[in-house]
């Protein structure tokens, strides 16, 4: 009761990968945890709006960082979104933390990538649990939330490939 969990699912269709995740609240939770889950989803949506054809990768991270910090949360810096295609993790790295917009790789039509901001209630530092070499844990043991979609950049903007 009161826990928040992330379910991250990847699929392969005709040799092409996709990646998506969602947050779920188990029963009733605290207002603080609900705000965190909501903020993480808002950060995904804000990152999507910031991703424009011929814009820059850092535009995404800057928009996410600005929103999360305004809400009183931190953005994990050690993990990022990624290109997706015939391999599960491809270039480019899509960082969700940025101090300035207008930097990094140009976002061009045809690019397929994920946006998956991980938003922490406390500090941004995380580590990978050695028990399974996959589970991400916050160093301060405070809650974290993450939402993710896979997109293709078109001439007019992002098209969501996952639901």
Q: What is the meaning of each model-derived region?
A:
Residues 1-163:
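Active-site neighborhoods and metal-handling regions in enzymes and metal-associated proteins
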């Amino acid at each position: 009761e009161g826990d928040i969990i992330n379910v991250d699912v990847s699929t392969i269709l005709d040799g092409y990968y996709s990646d998506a995740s969602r947050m779920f609240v188990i029963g009733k939770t605290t207002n603080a945890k609900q705000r965190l889950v909501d903020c993480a989803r808002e950060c995904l949506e804000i990152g999507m709006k910031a991703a424009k054809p011929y814009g820059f990768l850092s535009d995404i991270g800057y928009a996410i960082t600005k929103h999360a910090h305004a809400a009183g949360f931190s953005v994990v810096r050690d993990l990022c979104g990624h290109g997706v295609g015939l391999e599960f993790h491809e270039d480019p790295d899509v960082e969700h933390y940025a101090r300035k917009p207008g930097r990094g790789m140009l976002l061009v039509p045809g690019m397929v990538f994920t946006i998956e901001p991980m938003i922490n209630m406390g500090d941004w530092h995380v580590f990978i649990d050695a028990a399974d070499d996959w589970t991400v844990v916050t160093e301060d043991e405070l809650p974290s939330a993450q939402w993710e979609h896979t997109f293709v950049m078109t001439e007019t903007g992002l098209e969501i490939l996952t639901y």
